[in-house]
Amino acid sequence: MKIAVINSGSSSIKFKLYLMPQSIVLAHVHVEKIGETSSKITFRHTDKKEVFSNKIDTHHEGLRVINDILKEYQIIEHFSSLDAIAHRVVHGGDFFKSATLINEDVIYKIRELIPLSPLHNRANLEGILVSLKKAPSVPQIAVFDTSFHASLPKEAYLYALPYELYKEHKIRRFGFHGISHAYVLKKVAQEMQKNLHGLNMITLHLGNGSSACAIRNGKSVDTSMGFTPLEGLVMGSRSGDIDPQIVIYLQKELGYGLDEVEELLNRHSGLIGVCGEIDLREIIKRDDELSHVALDMMTRRVKKYIGAYMALLGRVDAIAFCAGIGENSSEVREKILKNLELFGIELDTKANEKNLTKISKQTSKIEVFVINTDEELEIALEAEALLRA
């Protein structure tokens, strides 16, 4: 079974073609800078990698270029020969609890959710609409970042606001990065040789966008992101948790408009807001006070969530780091786990420095892992499961 996975961004398309159930990657194409003067196309196939430029004005043209590349290398003749096309969609709201076959109703609901994730859902929908035009006869499946958190109990997803706001307007915690958290859960269960449905763990997806997740018996029971991906951890350009009254103060006392506040919290806060740099690798290299403070704020926030989730779960079998920072920064992992020995977490510093899969000591009561998350593969697995159901 050949399943294509499409992750459509505002100016990019990530395309991976899998042979399932073997989970073999047949091709990987990344189209960047759509709509700009010169677009970049990166193509990987077996051991080959090619990078070339072309002017691509729209997502429709982007998919046509991908199709042309796959045809040229005799991987597939046309998208219509695929068994399925699976799309990443960031926000599924209250509507979607699992992977879903796309129809007119699904498209309508994804469009309805754009205000809750304007940066992502609009672009995700664009990829779906273009793909449907290219291959109308191929089953197309939406896999949602919010679905893994559909198991949150009411006390976790409700905000302490008037209940009518939830009933009438669905203002609640949804959580994000669910595709990544789900994949990491499966990999840790394999590493520990345990049934994932009996596993209690904390997953830490740390990248430019970051979130923590508390998992009990293989189900998400709490997560740091909320109604939108703005809540929770200190991120590259997002504030994470702040006193909500700050938003009112910015508008009433400092004269900020609504759009300016949204821009401030999403694009000019977090690490870049504190020290002027978004790249954590550069922040670690720096020797100025604000860079040190930004790093300490970021790791301190993660540590606080670990403590809260340990108290919530009672028994914790494992902690797992993933995504760009979580997978690659031994310094960040060490700062986060420092002085947690009292809680049964013992870091093996040598294993951590080598970015090994398991980075806890043999004597550690809680095992600690570094997992290379693979959201595209998880999407393909969920799509395959839906098709075979």
From Swiss-Prot:
It is an enzyme of class 2 (transferase). SUPFAM superfamilies: Actin-like ATPase domain. Homodimer. Catalyzes the formation of acetyl phosphate from acetate and ATP. Can also catalyze the reverse reaction. It comes from Sulfurimonas denitrificans (strain ATCC 33889 / DSM 1251) (Thiomicrospira denitrificans (strain ATCC 33889 / DSM 1251)). Belongs to the acetokinase family. It is found in: Cytoplasm. It comes from the Bacteria. The record marks H177, R238 as: Transition state stabilizer. Substrate binds at R88. Mg(2+) binds at N7, E375. Its cofactor is Mg(2+); Mn(2+). This is Acetate kinase.
